[in-house]
Amino acid sequence: MRKIIHIDCDCFYAALEMRDDPSLRGKALAVGGSPDKRGVVATCSYEARAYGVRSAMAMRTALKLCPDLLVVRPRFDVYRAVSKQIHAIFRDYTDLIEPLSLDEAYLDVSASPHFAGSATRIAQDIRRRVAEELHITVSAGVAPNKFLAKIASDWRKPDGLFVITPEQVDGFVAELPVAKLHGVGKVTAERLARMGIRTCADLRQGSKLSLVREFGSFGERLWGLAHGIDERPVEVDSRRQSVSVECTFDRDLPDLAACLEELPTLLEELDGRLQRLDGSYRPDKPFVKLKFHDFTQTTVEQSGAGRDLESYRQLLGQAFARGNRPVRLIGVGVRLLDLQGAHEQLRLF
């Protein structure tokens, strides 16, 4: 049985701003772009979240919810440096590390000799060291697979630890609301509710075939998650192929015009994610992904196209024309050139 830890820093960017400027502590704080330039919230303090402010929200909306919100421009050089320090701590326990972002990672400690192989004690020690050495907090989840470890890390946020043992998996998953499953947004949850499915226990009552008929290949994934099954390995040093931002809408967007209205906010968030990349990648082909109301999806990309609003408008128009029906999800992204991988290939010759 595997032992997987999911580590997630608590409001990472905001935590570092408060660490480096004590006058910000205890304040409603958001890190992100200017509200005058369609800026979005990269992250925010828990004091800001109490007002309803959330990551990826338009900064203008955030300020309406919390007029006293303090807005700080991001310092990605600082965030990258601290992320490297956190990963150095991880490597003291295992080399099997899969980074998801600057502030989030999976660790496979199945074969780790530390603390007699106790994943719980390893997670406790990582949390202690990050707090003592870097003066920020992280939350951790321990479980037999990645799906459950990620859910566990969110269970007692902030500054928490939650453990799901192999013996607890079946009962824990049975009580989970289907909305907790990866890929299940509000629209899918409502669709499942109309089928009488609200928990994973409800999902288990049906057959895998019926879910596949209703949701396509996603139905098979749903069935596996409802049974606590996730065989995905921790992918060590997996090089990124792309950077993207996706949004699943509470209500399907009825036409192309409605889809186009969502582009500026999505592109602002995409630009923020691109800024967080290290220098071993170079942005290449832009792409747009659409998922229609019937769960069919399409992706359009174009070599040589720019990454400006007009280029994405054209790609979105092409993607919409392939389905020409209401849209439940829009994704925008960029394929990446792996400069590090290319350099390593050259060295081989």
Swiss-Prot record:
Residues 4-185 form the UmuC domain. One of its GO terms (biological process) is DNA-templated DNA replication. One of its GO terms (molecular function) is DNA-directed DNA polymerase activity. Coiled coil: none annotated. It is found in: Cytoplasm. Mg(2+) binds at residues 8, 103. It catalyses: DNA(n) + a 2'-deoxyribonucleoside 5'-triphosphate = DNA(n+1) + diphosphate. Monomer. NCBIfam families: PRK02406.1. This is DNA polymerase IV. It comes from Pseudomonas aeruginosa (strain ATCC 15692 / DSM 22644 / CIP 104116 / JCM 14847 / LMG 12228 / 1C / PRS 101 / PAO1). The lineage of its organism: Bacteria, Pseudomonadati, Pseudomonadota, Gammaproteobacteria, Pseudomonadales.
